[in-house]
Amino acid sequence: MTEKRPFNLDATPIVFGFANALKKEMTEAEKFLWENLRNRKLNNLKFRRQHPIGKFILDFYCHEKMVAVEVDGRIHNTEEMRERDEGRTYMLAEWGIKVIRFTNEEVINELHAVLETIKSFAR
């Protein structure tokens, strides 16, 4: 028997509600990256935006390859947020999900490199 791969991991209706709200409030960098991921534009991979999984909401998620892409603003530079992000990444790794993090600036200024990195993680 094969192990069940996480898709939403029993995310609650509250988490789904937050995810839907976040779709309407994406940052400029998230919108920019989404335009390059949506509709299987990157290597024919299906990405979802603001995807709920367990108690988390992933900026972008490719279930087929178990890859999460997070776009971080400046708030993620604080010690508290770095620790929170590390814990979140650890938990997602326990579920078999690889997490890639980029800054808003990397997405806006180095999109080609960002997309190449995502492709390499999704092999």
Regions found by a protein language model. Name each.
Residues H51-F121:
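Basic, amphipathic alpha-helical patches used to engage nucleic acids or provide basic targeting signals
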Residues M1-L45, R123:
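Solvent-exposed, charged helical/coil patches
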